[in-house]
Amino acid sequence: MSQLTEIVEQALAAIEGTDDLKALDEIRVDYLGKKGKITDMMKMMGKLSPAEKPAFGQAVNQAKQAVQKHLSERVEGLKAAELQATLAAESIDVTLPGRRIDNGGLHPVTRTIERIETFFGELGFSVKEGPEIEDDFHNFDALNISEHHPARADHDTFYFNPKVMLRTQTSGVQIRTMENEKPPLRIISPGRVYRNDYDQTHTPMFHQVEGLLVAENVNFAELKGILHDFLRNFFEEDLQVRFRPSYFPFTEPSAEVDVMGKNGKWLEVLGCGMVHPNVLRSVGIDPEKYSGFAFGMGVERLSMLRYGVNDLRSFFENDLRFLKQFK
């Protein structure tokens, strides 16, 4: 019996002395296998008297059970520790910041349009839109642009046929508004316009905002005051502004508006004037009773000046290196 006790103690010590699952399986075979040390003890049964056999057999079985139990507990413990180590290695630290999703930003042209709409909206101007495919009446005739005016030439205008074209300005929106609504009117009309031109400062498609005010007793001083305030608000500077006499078929008198640049040179930013009586007559408004003023500005031109962009084409190339500057 002392030999059996010694074998059990050796087995338990071997089990406790290893952290390797493969080694534990080898210990199981060495002690509990068919040729294992504890199994071999059963061979001694033949040398015992009948009276001793039951007690000895019971002792061997108890030894087997003790070693098997200790072995199972050790295997389970090691597997649990191995699992915990694996989970710890694969765990996610929820305190770490997540992956940032890049947010989009408004295009500089969109920003400029919104600034213009906000300013004139505070003055009571509503925003009107119209078709980009226009007929010659709304694009030319109603605006007092004669049949032989250079603006009607093929090299300036994209024609579908002699009477239908891509609009060259958003003035057609003003004509449609005056046809359908009665004065007093205060509107701005932002939108895309098209001209057959492409270089560093021109593109075939660009954005324009035109404004119109028609009411009784409207004068040029009001136009100057509004545009003065607009330019100073838009550029957020107390700019020098000048009005130069000019010519547009749809306004009389007409002027072009310049601002003083940082380089000390005048920069043209928009055109304006008092609505020509012929334009009012073309939409059934009495020019003896009503007068008005109109103005128009290129959105890309204003964006270039505000953001210091040198090439107009940058706005249309979808270069993220350029666009990310305006987030």
Swiss-Prot record:
GO molecular function term, any single one: ATP binding
Principal place of residence: cytoplasm
Cofactor details (free text): Binds 2 magnesium ions per tetramer.
GO biological process: phenylalanyl-tRNA aminoacylation
EC number in record: 6.1.1.20
Gene3D superfamilies from the UniProt entry: Bira Bifunctional Protein, Domain 2 (3.30.930.10)
Pfam families membership: Phe_tRNA-synt_N, tRNA-synt_2d
Listed name of the protein: Phenylalanine--tRNA ligase alpha subunit
Gene label: pheS
Keyword tags: Aminoacyl-tRNA synthetase, ATP-binding, Cytoplasm, Ligase, Magnesium, Metal-binding, Nucleotide-binding, Protein biosynthesis
Residues binding Mg(2+), per UniProt: E252
Subunit structure: Tetramer of two alpha and two beta subunits.
Top EC class, one word: ligase
Family: Belongs to the class-II aminoacyl-tRNA synthetase family. Phe-tRNA synthetase alpha subunit type 1 subfamily.
Organism: Shewanella woodyi (strain ATCC 51908 / MS32)
Record localization: Cytoplasm
InterPro entries: aa-tRNA-synth_II, aa-tRNA-synth_II/BPL/LPL, Phe-tRNA-synth_IIc_asu, Phe-tRNA_ligase_II_N, Phe_tRNA_ligase_alpha1_bac, Phenylalanyl-tRNA_Synthase, tRNA-bd_arm
Cross-referenced PANTHER family: PHENYLALANINE--TRNA LIGASE, MITOCHONDRIAL, PHENYLALANYL-TRNA SYNTHETASE
PROSITE patterns found in the cross-reference section: AA_TRNA_LIGASE_II (PS50862)
Catalytic activity: tRNA(Phe) + L-phenylalanine + ATP = L-phenylalanyl-tRNA(Phe) + AMP + diphosphate + H(+)
Cofactor(s) of this protein: Mg(2+)
GO CC annotation terms, alphabetical: cytoplasm
